[in-house]
């Protein structure tokens, strides 16, 4: 643990905007960094903090304002849970995030690893982080043959991490493990010769680094076909708010086709569990539904739209100059 703490101070990542002992900023960053790279998160984080600098301000925000700033990051349930969690923290904890991992992990959208990150970075709580990067480091360090995501693998990794975590500098230790996974012990071509763990790494000594972590066999991703309608009228594209349960809930999107229109193109988008193949048709009138709103081009650029829908509308040659 001591070697890793020293390595992080000397070689680890520093200066990221959320690297402060502030539970709110740490929590927002940890949620954003789930399934999303640091380079992408930086700009979103800056805009989010400018709009919602405290958990109290976030808790008081309306859903659409939050979804608008989140649009493009994907995995939109994260944004919905972020808002729900902020409201619980303000209502039940006086706007102060709990210090213990167990209580943090009961909050909406916070799992064990995120809870450990918030607690260790903000309060110095002795708790290990086991995110995707750390899992890769540990599976190579101990040549874990159980596939990641299985009960056996997860149990081993958590037990190992709990034994390894520094009792005096848990936050720095966790940052070191995350930094090693992100910058040294990478998925392909790991830089083992500069890794502070190479002396103890079983995979390095076997020359089997890229065999770990062991993955579950990939399931073929199902394909879903859909037809959407662009309602164009009064120099606006008319969108509907997705209120039903689904990945785009809370966003403004193209309504599902309910009448024939002119075929103006298609787009595909990969979700975590399926691929969407969408065909888009144009109709030159307003929709009959009551929850429709007209969007100018500027509205579409700035609004809470799913990234693939926004990209299609703004790139369409058929729609250029018409809204």
Regions found by a protein language model. Name each.
Residues 2-193, 197-206, 210, 223:
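Catalytic cores of DNA base-excision repair glycosylases
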Residues 1-14, 19, 182-323:
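Intrinsically disordered, low-complexity, charged terminal extensions of DNA damage-control enzymes
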């Amino acid at each position: 643990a001591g070697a890793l703490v020293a390595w992080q101070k000397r070689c680890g990542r520093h200066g990221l905007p959320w690297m402060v002992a502030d539970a709110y900023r740490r929590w927002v960053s940890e949620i954003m960094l789930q399934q999303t790279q640091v380079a992408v998160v930086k700009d979103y984080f800056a805009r989010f903090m400018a709009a919602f600098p405290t958990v109290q301000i976030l808790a008081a925000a309306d859903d659409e304002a939050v979804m608008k700033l989140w649009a493009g990051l994907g995995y939109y349930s994260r944004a919905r849970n972020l808002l729900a969690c902020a409201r619980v923290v303000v209502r039940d904890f006086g706007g102060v995030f709990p210090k213990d991992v167990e209580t943090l992990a009961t909050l909406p959208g916070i799992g064990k690893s995120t809870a450990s990150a918030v607690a260790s970075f903000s309060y110095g709580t002795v708790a290990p982080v086991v995110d995707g990067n750390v899992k890769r480091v540990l599976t190579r360090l101990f040549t874990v043959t159980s596939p990641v995501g299985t009960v056996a693998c997860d149990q081993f990794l958590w037990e190992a991490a709990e034994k390894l975590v520094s009792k005096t500098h848990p936050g720095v230790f966790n940052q070191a493990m995350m930094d090693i996974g992100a910058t040294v012990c990478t998925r392909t071509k790991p830089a083992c010769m500069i890794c502070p763990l190479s002396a103890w790494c079983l995979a390095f000594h076997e020359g089997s680094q890229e065999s770990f972590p062991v993955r579950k066999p990939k399931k073929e991703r199902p394909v879903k076909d859909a037809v959407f309608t662009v309602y164009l009228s009064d120099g606006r594209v008319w969108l509907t708010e997705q209120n039903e349960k689904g990945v785009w809930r809370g966003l403004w999107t193209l309504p599902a086709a309910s009448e024939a229109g002119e075929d103006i193109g298609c787009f595909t988008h990969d979700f975590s569990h399926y691929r969407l193949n969408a065909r888009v048709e144009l109709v030159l009138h307003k929709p009959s539904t009551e929850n429709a709103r007209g969007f100018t081009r500027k509205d579409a650029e700035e609004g809470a739209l799913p990234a693939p829908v926004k990209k299609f509308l703004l790139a369409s040659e058929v729609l250029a100059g018409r809204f």
